[in-house]
């Protein structure tokens, strides 16, 4: 389009679904000549030049570079955290939109925030600036779909149902039934604490109570707002988003509950209206020092490059940090321990290589040391504290070589290699440069496929010449029973189910990186699916 000045993005590329990862700093600026447009981009309605983002504030905002298939609901969702959205005009042919907020103050907050943290829709950066128009007047007969969606959102914001007879598209929002949200965290590569959830969801209203728990091997939470409208806005804005880059995906639904009964204030549950509640009997899920480290390091306000809550100085600081190249995975790499102590091992069977393979499912193992004077115990050093925590959460209590292993955080900060010339009988191995690390490539799909040990294994990198019977025989030879098998359509991947989780663990240890010929080494991981 003539008159559009090319944007310059500074910093680290950021996907649309990153809530706590690196931000992008941009300088959108445009000088559009007068154009005549309607809701579908045809010649009819005249809008005069939209000069520049840092012009006079207006409650009408001009949004550019929208993806072609973006919906009205997605555009409206951009404004919901900042206040009531009162009008919208989609310019489909121009990949642009005008969004009107109820107040100029809300619009200023929105522009300031998105100037520091570039918004994305469908993995595409978009640009938001003030419009020269102080009010958005649209012909509803030409903009019926957008108006229907807006009416639905307005109905939710006022806690009423939509107007009778109003047709709302399938992508439009529906009235909230409950102030309680049910949240499931998929691909939970990094731990998610109660405090992290509180800070993320507090952007949309007062969070009263949170209860976290694990069900069906998935971390879940129930979160209660004071107002159903806040729950609706949070669901609309956050469902499907990632807390961290490429992992920890939020799946949000309304709960059938309308009120949560919280008995204890601890790291699993919290009633923010009752600070007097006891912490409860028993040990917390995390050691208090570790929990504090996670709360500090993963805090939305504390992470350089994080998408902060709606506090503009913090958002600006985040963007500046991203531009300075200081963006990285938030976590406890600074304060958390990277070394695990694994005990109750089968000392007749266990080797550094077998521990490397199993613990390598949950992080990049750097070093392994089986203790010389206590060979049923080992120290395992992971790449960072998040990985050690993840491995501990998933592997503590699992059966390996017939024994239930115990995994705890070690007091050691590193695993020492034996002195040069000293023979430690192969009990210590350095895997720092191993080509088998699953997570050394940033953004790897492996981040999205981390699941607890299960009887079902995911197999990949299968050459065309290998048949189902070949793989069944191969896995049966590990000492277990193959219960089911299913090839994916391209035959490069498959699911294989063993009789027990212990058998699946054994098969993974034995066959991950197995040479199938034709320069194909088998990749094995745990699956959340069943056959």
UniProtKB/Swiss-Prot annotation:
Occurrences of domain RRM (ranges): 59-133, 181-257, 338-412, 455-529
Name under which the protein is recorded: Polypyrimidine tract-binding protein 2
Cellular component GO terms, alphabetical: growth cone; neuronal cell body; nucleus; spliceosomal complex
N-acetylmethionine modification, residue list: 1
Keyword RNA-binding: yes
Key word Nucleus present: yes
GO process terms (BP): cerebellum development; mRNA splice site recognition; negative regulation of RNA splicing; regulation of neural precursor cell proliferation; regulation of RNA splicing; spinal cord development
Modified residues (Phosphoserine): 26-27, 308
Record lineage: Eukaryota, Metazoa, Chordata, Craniata, Vertebrata
Main location: nucleus
An example Gene Ontology molecular-function term: mRNA binding
Subunit relationships: Monomer. Interacts with NOVA1; the interaction is direct. Identified in a mRNP complex, at least composed of DHX9, DDX3X, ELAVL1, HNRNPU, IGF2BP1, ILF3, PABPC1, PCBP2, PTBP2, STAU1, STAU2, SYNCRIP and YBX1. Part of a ternary complex containing KHSRP and HNRPH1. Interacts with NOVA2; the interaction is direct.
Tissue and organ distribution: Mainly expressed in brain although also detected in other tissues like heart and skeletal muscle. Isoform 1 and isoform 2 are specifically expressed in neuronal tissues. Isoform 3 and isoform 4 are expressed in non-neuronal tissues. Isoform 5 and isoform 6 are truncated forms expressed in non-neuronal tissues.
Keyword entries, A-Z: Acetylation, mRNA processing, mRNA splicing, Nucleus, Phosphoprotein, Repeat, RNA-binding
Top-level taxon of origin: Eukaryota
UniProt-listed PANTHER family: MATRIN 3/NUCLEAR PROTEIN 220-RELATED
Cellular localization per UniProt: Nucleus
Function field: RNA-binding protein which binds to intronic polypyrimidine tracts and mediates negative regulation of exons splicing. May antagonize in a tissue-specific manner the ability of NOVA1 to activate exon selection. In addition to its function in pre-mRNA splicing, plays also a role in the regulation of translation.
């Amino acid at each position: 389009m003539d008159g559009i000045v090319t944007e310059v993005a500074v910093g680290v590329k950021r996907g649309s679904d990153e809530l706590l990862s690196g931000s992008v700093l941009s300088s959108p600026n445009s000088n559009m000549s007068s154009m005549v447009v309607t809701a579908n981009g045809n010649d009819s309605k005249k809008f005069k030049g939209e000069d520049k983002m840092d012009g006079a504030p207006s409650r009408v905002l001009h949004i550019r570079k929208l993806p072609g298939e973006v919906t009205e609901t997605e555009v409206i969702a951009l404004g919901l955290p900042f206040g009531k959205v009162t009008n919208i005009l989609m310019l489909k042919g121009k990949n642009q939109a005008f969004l009107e907020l109820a107040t100029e103050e809300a619009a200023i907050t929105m522009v300031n925030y998105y100037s520091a943290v570039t918004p994305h829709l469908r993995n595409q950066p978009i640009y938001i600036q003030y419009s020269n128009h102080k009010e958005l007047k649209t012909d509803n007969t030409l903009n019926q779909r957008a108006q229907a969606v807006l009416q639905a959102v307005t109905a939710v914001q006022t806690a009423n149902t939509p107007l009778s007879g109003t047709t709302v598209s399938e992508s439009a929002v529906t009235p909230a039934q409950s102030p309680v949200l049910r949240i499931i965290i998929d691909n939970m590569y990094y731990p998610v604490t109660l405090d992290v959830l509180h800070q993320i969801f507090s952007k949309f209203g007062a969070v009263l109570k949170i209860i976290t728990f694990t069900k069906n091997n998935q971390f879940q939470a129930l979160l209660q707002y004071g107002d159903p409208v806040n729950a609706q806005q949070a669901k609309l804005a956050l469902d499907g988003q990632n807390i961290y880059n490429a992992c920890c995906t939020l799946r949000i639904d309304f709960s059938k509950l309308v009120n949560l009964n919280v008995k204890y204030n601890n790291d699993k549950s919290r009633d923010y209206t009752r600070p007097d509640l006891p912490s409860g009997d028993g040990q917390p899920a995390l050691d208090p020092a570790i929990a504090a480290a996670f709360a500090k390091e993963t805090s939305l306000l504390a992470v350089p490059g994080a998408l902060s809550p709606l506090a503009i100085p913090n958002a600006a600081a985040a963007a500046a940090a991203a531009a300075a190249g200081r963006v990285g995975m938030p976590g406890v790499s600074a304060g958390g321990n990277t070394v695990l102590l694994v005990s109750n091992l089968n000392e007749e069977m266990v080797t550094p290589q077998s521990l490397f393979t199993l613990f390598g499912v949950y992080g990049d193992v750097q070093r392994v040391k089986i203790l010389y004077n206590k060979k049923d115990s080992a120290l395992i050093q992971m790449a960072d504290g998040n990985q050690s925590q993840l491995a501990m959460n998933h592997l503590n209590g699992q059966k390996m070589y017939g024994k239930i292993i115990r995994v705890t955080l070690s007091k050691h900060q590193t695993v020492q290699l034996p002195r040069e010339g000293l023979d430690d009988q192969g009990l210590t191995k350095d895997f720092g440069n191993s080509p088998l690390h699953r997570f050394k490539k940033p953004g790897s799909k492996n981040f999205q496929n981390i699941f607890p040990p299960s009887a079902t294994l995911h197999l990949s990198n299968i050459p065309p010449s290998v048949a189902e019977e070949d793989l069944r025989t191969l896995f049966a030879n590990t000492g277990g029973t193959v219960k089911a098998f299913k090839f994916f359509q391209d035959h490069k991947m498959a699911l294989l189910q063993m009789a027990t989780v212990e058998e699946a663990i054994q098969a993974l240890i034995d066959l991950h990186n197995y040479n199938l010929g034709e320069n194909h080494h088998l990749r094995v991981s745990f699956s959340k699916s069943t056959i």
